[in-house]
Amino acid sequence: VTKAGFGVLLNLHYSDFWADPGKQFKPKAWESYGVKELEQAVYDFTLEMMHLYLENGVNITMVQVGNELSNGLLWPEGKVPNYDNIAAFVNAGIRAVRKADEERLAGSIKGVCPQMEGLSKIPVMIHLDNGGNNALYREWFDNFTKRGEDFELIGLSYYPFWHGTLDMLTNNMNDIAERYGKELIIAEVSMGYTMEDYKDYEKLTDE
């Protein structure tokens, strides 16, 4: 991807498997950790991944701390409504990104992609699902911004068969852009030819 001239969005899930609003399970290696240990583990892992990708010349143009965090991360400690813990974990990831970026700009990381020379700051995105649900975004980001580190972008998932109409998405984006003063990105989207849930078609035969 880097050789082709594209930037890379580094998406950190903080789980042994894909994480989304229905499953935000801690890695097995972290299962016995308390809140402070989880916070440190997020920081250490994020910094390690930043070093790994930067040292191997990957053109990181954005970092996503967690995936679809609508219901939190690192359950059960970081499950909504435990916003103090959610903020602690997300903040740890953001701080690690900032630390690695400081090292990149200082020239202390070798092998950094030349395409990143003009990038003054690697932006951080926080990503929720259900892009048409304004109440969700207000509740989540109202709570996080009282406790959280600074970040640059809000990411939204939008699947119309789950997340409402385009008008609902537009209204939500207009509201949160003004309310939080962040850039927005639709991080996941699928516009199918039907509004029916595809789960109805997953089992086509009895065999």
Predicted regions and their residues:
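Short, well-ordered coil/turn elements that cap or connect secondary structure elements
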Residues: 3, 119, 179-181
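Short glycine-enriched loops at secondary-structure junctions
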Residues: 12-18, 66-68, 190-191
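N-terminal carbohydrate-binding/catalytic regions of secreted carbohydrate-active enzymes
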Residues: 1-3, 7
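Short helix-capping and hinge/turn segments at secondary-structure transitions, especially at repeat
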Residues: 102, 146-150, 156-159, 178-185
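Hydrophobic faces of well-ordered beta-strands that scaffold small-molecule active sites
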Residues: 8-12, 61-65, 124-126, 152-156, ...
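Short, catalytically relevant binding-site loops at active-site mouths
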Residues: 130-133, 159-163, 190-194
